[in-house]
Design a protein with these regions (language model features):
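Single-stranded nucleic acid-binding surfaces, predominantly the OB-fold ssDNA-binding core
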Residues: 1-96
Length: 96
């Protein structure tokens, strides 16, 4: 199973673009900060995650402004074939 849910602030929005077949694509960065418990100890997390939304979801995500808090559900995939870098492919985006 490859499923991820994360909440954070929209940090950077790229311009809307289209694939050669006409599918809308919106890429953005999500800034996440949280405290979790690991091995019984608190651990502070702060990271930026690359996100891509496609199709109708990309059009909907255009209404999201910088700094807006969102909850995203989706899956991780390599940025390109054989890459060690991953990004979150959004399947649901909810503004908080």
């Amino acid at each position: 199973m490859n499923r991820l849910e994360v909440q954070g602030q929209v940090f950077e929005l790229s311009p809307l673009r289209y694939t050669p077949s006409g599918v809308a694509v919106l890429e953005f960065l999500l800034s996440h900060e949280a405290e979790v418990i690991e091995a019984g100890q608190p651990r502070r997390l702060a990271f930026t995650l690359a996100v891509v939304a496609m199709g109708d979801l990309a059009q909907m995500a255009l209404t999201t402004s910088l700094g807006c808090t969102v909850r995203i559900q989706g899956f991780l995939a390599p940025v390109r074939k054989d890459s060690q870098k991953f990004r979150l492919h959004a399947q649901q985006i909810q503004q908080i």
